[in-house]
Structure formats: C-alpha cells, structure tokens
Amino acid sequence: MSVPQSKTWLVDGFCRFTTRMVRKSFQCFAVQGLDQIPSIAASNCSLVVYANHIGWWDPIVAMLLRKKYLPDRVFYAPIDAKALEAYGVFRQLGFYGLKLETFAGASDFLKTSREILSDPKSSVWITPEGVFCDCRDLEQPFMPGLAHLAATTPNTIFVPLAIEYPFWQEPKPMIATRFGEPLSFQAGASKADCGKKIFESLRDTQRHLASSVMRRDFSEFDFVVAPKSQRLGLYDNLRAWKAWLQGRPFDPSHASINGKDSTSPGQRN
C-alpha cells in the first residue's frame, strides 16, 4: 500500500463544509487540554492522536481539531477499506484503507503508517478500539496495531483524545473533547509496555472529560464552535413575548428556565 495523498487545500475545504454541518447538528464543539498543544506543534516529531470511537462523527471531529489547533500537521487517518472503496474522494483527504482482520492487512497498516510518520510534519488520527463503543465503556480492549506502531516509531508523539456527544439543557447535543498528556517511546520499548501506557492514558483522559461533562459547566472548556441557543417555534416565541412584557431581555437557552447562567462563554485563556 502506497502512502495516501493528503491535499491540504481539499482537507481545509472539507473542514469548512463540515463546520457548517456541526453548527447545524450540535449546540457547540468544546475542547479541553489545549495546554498540550504548543509543545506538540513546536515538536520536530511526527504525531499520532488516538481517540475512543463513539460513532460516525469521529473522523470529522478529528479533522476539525487538526485544522483549528495543529494546522501545520498533514492529516492522515486509517479507515475501513470497504468504506474507502465506497467514498473514493477520501483518498485525497489523507484516509487509507484498513483490513486488520487479516495478517496481510495488519502488515500493510503498519508499513503505511510508518512511512507516513517518517515525515515529522505528519499526523495520524486513529481509533484503536476498532468498533463503535459507548464513551463510558472503559474496558473495551484496543486492537494491537497501535501498540506495534508505538514500539517501532521512536520519533513520534502519541496523544490521547477523549470524545463524547452529550446532551445538556438544549435540544441538540454538544461535541465534548479533551487532549490528554502526550507520550513518547524509546527505541526498543516493548509492545506490551507501549500498549499498556496507551490504553491507560486514553482511559484516564476519558475519565477527566466525563467528570467535566457531568458538571455541565461551559467555563471548563474552550470552543471550536461556540455555544448558541436557538428558539424552538411557538414555545420560545411565547417565552420571548413574556420577557418583553416583563421588560427584560429574552434568553433562548433552556438553562435559563431553571435560573442557571447560560450565557455563551468566550475563549478561556
């Protein structure tokens, strides 16, 4: 398998399109762990970001995070080979086929990934669980490919990424993400040791994100897409009319019904 193309202009154009999709489908796109980004961006090492795998939106989340926070990194991501055949344009976006159910497929994945990561400006975004999992399932084992990769690419930084799609007060869910502590592995590191550290680091990152999600506090996050409340037809029009009669501004957020502060925050420092 040859190294896939990743045309930056096409990836960025796709990101502009999917940002509109996110705005339409989600209340906001929130992120934590940005204190890790400056050292990662400045590093002369290639990058692997590995995330839990909840559903269809995960690759879009990865692409938008790369564009927003790591724009100088070239985007690559393994994807099921059958899906890649169905959506051939993805080959131009840095996606490459994955057939881990066979020895030859696993070997191709490792060979292609190593070739990609030989470029210090590259980034591979991967979901090592291999199947869709609930974000609270912290026991699902990882497929072995990532541990093999970590043990054989010493000049690469590995960064865990936790993802959730929770509902808060609004009718649409939010995207909640968190970057964890970067890892690197010395030449000669054992596959077992790499696999253990990678697994534990992602699960710890998921736990931290889950705690924040359950607190429902926007001030704990930065935003790729900031929160925005929307009116819901007749019900919210009546609420707006009532607010006008009472001489107060109308807050369309449903948190305001319970007397909670629901103002959309700006970026945190």
What are the functions of these language-model segments?
Residues 41-103:
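Catalytic core of membrane glycerolipid acyltransferases/transacylases, capturing the structured
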Residues 31, 77, 95-97, 158, ...:
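Conserved beta-strand scaffold positions in the cores of enzyme catalytic domains, especially
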Residues 2-6, 107-269:
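Non-catalytic C-terminal accessory region of glycerolipid acyltransferases
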Residues 27-30, 103-107, 139-140:
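A conditional alpha-helix N-cap/helix-loop micro-motif detector
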